[in-house]
């Protein structure tokens, strides 16, 4: 087995490296790939982004958002998490066999003192009944990867804030994540492993899995200039691409209602491929003009605060909504007001 760690903390680059290895690497031997991410959310291949995240909070906290090529649910990562990926040929007994690919990880954790770590359900690793690792797979052209998270010292307060969306505001056909009780591994490890840097935790895991006393003796899989160029191209094509991240979301409906001093306004929006496909407005507000021009300006627009703001820039919204402020109306459309401070 060969070994690779990413020097980047950007989830988009790290997923692009994984995709490049999946598509182009010499897999005569499996590759064990580790990466550590700055705060980010990774949604599953078939999920509705806006059904999984608190967009306003994510924007305010500058949390990176992307979509991976594998299925499964949304996860939050930060610099207290280590992600691992086994990239190998598909021998016909790999896809869906999470036990096979998590067994080396569990063995390593047991050796580090987390003897209660175990697999549970389809693709989770638990300790003391709490989840510390979610796993997913992707198979294509006779190759597959199985990747997962390992929460060593993640800021758990961020998870609920970043992944929470008010349930009564959305009716979606996407695959919603199942929220689980989560925990960090650190307090369950032997004392000598409870105060490691995240890099030292990663390297200790790697040595245990690879069966070497020193990673300098492990076989590596370096990325040459051509590989780096390929990674950059994949990053732009997929993981930094708005259409890949948001445009893959299934159609869904939103209902946003708020009472202002000048009246109540309710927007109902149909979102498809990350854009406003249709919308209507209801309320007891007073405007001097019919609201249809507002609706026309918004149809086909990306469902983001910036895009909605730009689309309405040349309209005097007071003609349509009376004394309700422009910023408040835009906040209502995209629900920016729901951000948790």
Where are these regions (language model features)?
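A generic structural motif
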Residues: 88-94, 187-194, 282-285
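Contiguous, small/hydrophobic- and glycine-enriched helical/loop subdomains that border
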Residues: 81-122
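FAD-binding core of FAD-dependent oxidoreductases
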Residues: 68-83, 125-127, 131, 136-145
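Structured beta-strand/loop patches that form or line metal/cofactor-binding pockets in enzymes
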Residues: 228-272
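Long, positively charged amphipathic alpha-helical accessory segments at protein N-termini or as interdomain linkers
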Residues: 105, 112-114, 133, 141-246, ...
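Short, glycine/charge-rich beta-strand/loop segments that flank catalytic centers
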Residues: 36-39, 118-129
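N-terminal lobe of the biotin/lipoate ligase/transferase fold
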Residues: 1-96
